[in-house]
UniProtKB/Swiss-Prot annotation:
Its main location: nucleus. This is Coiled-coil domain-containing protein 106. It comes from Mus musculus. Promotes the degradation of p53/TP53 protein and inhibits its transactivity. Residues 62-101 form a coiled coil. The modification Phosphoserine is found at residue 129.
């Protein structure tokens, strides 16, 4: 029995020894295990790599949004400039149409009508029941009167036409600088203070109301706050238009200056005209 037990133990040990032989290849198995674990570590480290494209995409979207906002603001400013230029050109067109209409009406009113006078005189002679001598004398008097009347109308029409042409040429001169704007503003202001009517003052000087409103900030700045002219600078026609210079003058009017302007407008020391610009 003891021999069997010893043999069994020996066989068991041998079997155990034989079973333990594969463990000598443990380094090979360890390398396989390490090789299998390596992809899992890579998978764990992948989320930070996947997060970087998202951040790049967000930054790109922000940049595109910023560019779109800048372009939108630029387009908005461009639209405002074009609208102001459209209003200015529309005012000039209305002014031209009204002046042409007034010229046509004045021409029709001042045009002499000799045929009508002759017809009236002949009708009077035909309807008369006096003798032939009286009719002939009456026709002679009427012809002399009509001739003198035509001559008087012709002289009157020529003088009035000359006077009207001078006024039209003087008033149609377009202002080209700040001094011209101020001079025109003071003329209209003096007429307004006499006539007590804005529309009649503009009609008297043959100037459109919107045209004056577009350049009003220049005149108000020169009258109320001439010290601010240093901030705005002198007008240079080679660098900017008069409309753009008027906008800069409007932006230079602070709250205190605007209060002074409103007070002077209420007392009729300035033209009570609204601005065409917005802050």
């Amino acid at each position: 029995m003891n021999d069997r037990n010893n043999r069994w133990r020996t066989m068991k040990d041998e079997e155990t020894f034989e079973i333990s032989i594969p463990f000598e290849e443990a380094p090979h198995l360890d390398s396989q295990i390490l090789y299998r674990l390596s992809p899992s570590r890579r998978n764990v480290e992948e989320p930070p790599e996947g997060a970087s494209p998202t951040l790049a995409l967000m930054s790109s979207v922000k940049a595109q949004l910023h560019m779109a906002l800048e372009r939108n603001s630029w387009l908005q400013k461009r639209i405002e400039d074009l609208e102001e230029e459209r209003d200015f050109l529309r005012c000039q067109l209305d002014k031209f149409i009204s002046s042409a209409r007034m010229d046509a009406e004045d021409y029709c009113r001042m045009k002499p009508g000799p045929r009508r006078v002759d017809g009236d005189s002949r009708a009077g002679v035909g309807e008369a029941s006096d003798p032939e001598s009286a009719a002939s004398s009456f026709s002679g008097v009427s012809e002399d009167g009509s001739a003198s009347e035509r001559k008087r109308q012709k002289q009157k029409g020529s003088t009035s036409r000359k006077r009207f042409g001078k006024t039209k040429a003087r008033e149609r001169q377009r202002v080209k600088d700040a001094d011209g704007v101020l001079c025109r503003y003071k003329k209209i202001l003096g007429t307004f203070q006499k006539l007590k009517s804005m529309s009649r003052a503009f009609e008297h000087h043959r100037v459109d109301r919107n045209t004056v409103a577009l350049t009003t900030p220049i005149a108000e700045l020169l009258i109320v706050a001439p010290e601010k002219l240093a901030e705005v600078g002198e007008f240079d026609p080679s660098k900017e238009r008069l409309l753009e210079y008027s906008r800069r003058c409007f932006l230079a009017l602070d709250d205190e200056t605007l209060k002074k302007v409103q007070a002077l407008k209420k007392s009729k020391l300035l033209l009570p005209i609204t601005y065409r610009f917005k802050r």
